[in-house]
């Protein structure tokens, strides 16, 4: 009898947790992965596929446990670079882990939401750029929270006068994330899409390979200005 009661209690607690998570984030099918991180982040995972957004245009698939267990330490290691106070200041509390993340059928590494204090991450993202992607997506939250601090018009003036950004990131074919050998103000092709993506790319390199950036800015005046701005 005690065994049966214990099973019922565990089931009820799981239901309560699932309901609380949904009420907070409005994302279905989430379960707790870890809530005891060093900086207070709560890690959740997709137990089943989900679609969210007004038009259900954001979708992500559930991950197998072995996939989660492999990628979680990488995610935690990178996000542990931020102290709890900084995360609170930038409205990040919940990390949602899933795979094959898309927005309107376009693949993406992450979906930040400062209103829900959440960041959805695709653990199936290209391993070469996975760690950078984490910081890239978090930067979008930082910029959204402190929009006045990041003047995109001023940022654009750092570039050569002949250069023009695209109208939007999704209407640009500048998508390559590999590092340029000759930067000339831009670390990757994706940096050339729009100012906010350029900022996020620069920030992501600063958080993952600061020594490389120090070398690059010695011979790149434009990139030097951008790094100092951030």
PLM feature spans:
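Auxiliary, metal-adjacent structural segments of Zn-dependent hydrolase domains
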Residues: 50-115
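Non-catalytic architectural context of zinc metalloproteases
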Residues: 19-69, 98-100, 167-180, 196-198, ...
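Non-catalytic terminal regions of proteins
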Residues: 40, 47-49, 90-93, 121
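Classical Sec-dependent N-terminal signal peptides that target proteins to the secretory pathway
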Residues: 1-20
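Active-site-flanking segments in enzyme catalytic domains
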Residues: 94-230
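Intrinsic-disorder-associated interaction segments
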Residues: 11-14, 34, 61-64, 68-71, ...
């Amino acid at each position: 009898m005690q065994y049966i009661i214990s099973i019922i209690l565990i089931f009820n607690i799981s239901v309560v947790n699932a309901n609380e998570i949904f009420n907070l984030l409005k994302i279905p099918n989430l379960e707790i992965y870890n809530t005891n991180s060093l900086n207070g982040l709560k890690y959740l995972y997709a137990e089943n596929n989900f679609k969210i957004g007004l038009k259900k245009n954001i979708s992500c698939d559930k991950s197998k446990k072995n996939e989660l267990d492999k990628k979680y330490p990488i995610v935690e290691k990178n996000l542990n670079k931020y102290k709890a106070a900084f995360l609170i200041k930038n409205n990040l509390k919940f990390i949602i882990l899933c795979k094959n993340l898309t927005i309107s059928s376009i693949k993406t590494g992450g979906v930040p939401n400062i209103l829900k204090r959440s960041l959805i991450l695709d653990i199936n993202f290209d391993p070469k750029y996975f760690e950078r992607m984490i910081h890239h997506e978090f930067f979008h939250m930082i910029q959204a929270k402190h929009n006045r601090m990041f003047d995109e018009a001023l940022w654009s003036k750092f570039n050569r006068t002949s250069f023009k950004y695209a109208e939007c990131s999704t209407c640009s074919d500048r998508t390559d994330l590999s590092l340029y050998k000759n930067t000339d103000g831009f670390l990757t092709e994706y940096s050339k899409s729009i100012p906010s993506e350029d900022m996020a790319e620069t920030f992501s390199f600063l958080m993952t390979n600061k020594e490389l950036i120090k070398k690059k800015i010695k011979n790149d005046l434009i990139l030097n200005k951008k790094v100092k701005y951030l």
